Regions:
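Ferredoxin-like iron-sulfur electron-transfer modules
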Residues: 6-15, 37-45, 62-83, 88-89, ...
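A short, flexible low-complexity segment enriched in Lys/Arg and Gly/Pro that occurs
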Residues: 1-4
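Amphipathic alpha-helical segments that form the core helices of the histone-fold
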Residues: 28-37
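N-terminal glycine-rich anion-binding loops that anchor highly charged ligand groups
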Residues: 19-29
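Flanking helices and flexible, charged tails adjoining ferredoxin-like Fe-S electron-transfer domains
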Residues: 110, 116-199
């Protein structure tokens, strides 16, 4: 049996990183498909088109979608937003702007419609609003594809990769700062201990 490259499978997915398939994102789902551990009908945002393409690529029978999903983008009721940043942390493509204790807003052209921002909102001020675009996000700056479906997916993938790199960089900087502070505290304690011994 021929193994299909994971990237070939991932390329067919919409790159929303929505987790509707039960996996942590599009690439983990592609890995599971490649390993024969997942059915081809789990990608709700991809719909029938993606499921048929996956079935064709993997040489599997077409299965009806396990779930369906209406194309929608997040909309924050800015008058109800308390600025908790829970939605910002949840967004896998950095499509939400705001700061702690200030009003947040969705950059609708960048929203993939994943819906991951809705559940963590403590004041229930985020709605998913149906849109007519067949492929999200509507922004396409980070794509070279002429086909709208793949252009949207490439753009979303690029945004996700940038988001992931930023988070890793922020985490590394935070750990380095904590290590510096810890080293400074230990050095101060050692100096105080030496001073007490000398006295």
């Amino acid at each position: 049996m021929m193994t299909i490259p994971i990237q070939s499978i991932s390329r067919l997915l919409p790159q929303t990183q929505c987790r509707e398939c039960g996996y942590e994102g599009c690439l983990p789902y592609a890995r599971a498909l490649s390993a024969g551990e997942a059915p081809v009908n789990l990608c709700a945002p991809g719909g029938e088109t993606v499921m048929k393409d996956l079935a064709d690529l993997l040489g599997k029978p077409y299965l009806a979608p396990a779930k369906t999903q209406i194309k929608a983008v997040a909309l924050i009721d800015e008058s109800a937003c308390i600025g908790c940043t829970a939605c910002i942390r949840a967004c896998p493509v950095d499509a939400i702007m705001g700061a702690s204790k200030l009003m947040h807003t969705v950059i609708s052209d960048e929203c993939t419609g994943c819906g991951l921002c809705v559940t963590p909102c403590p004041v229930d001020c985020i709605d998913m609003v149906p849109v007519s675009q067949p492929f999200l996000p509507s922004a396409r700056r980070f794509s070279t594809s002429a086909e709208p479906r793949f252009a949207a997916a490439e753009h979303a993938q690029s945004r996700f990769e940038r988001h992931t790199a930023r988070k890793q960089r922020d985490d590394a900087e935070r750990k380095a700062l904590l290590a510096q502070r810890e080293a400074a505290v230990k050095a101060k304690q050692a100096a105080q201990a030496q001073a007490q011994i000398a006295a």
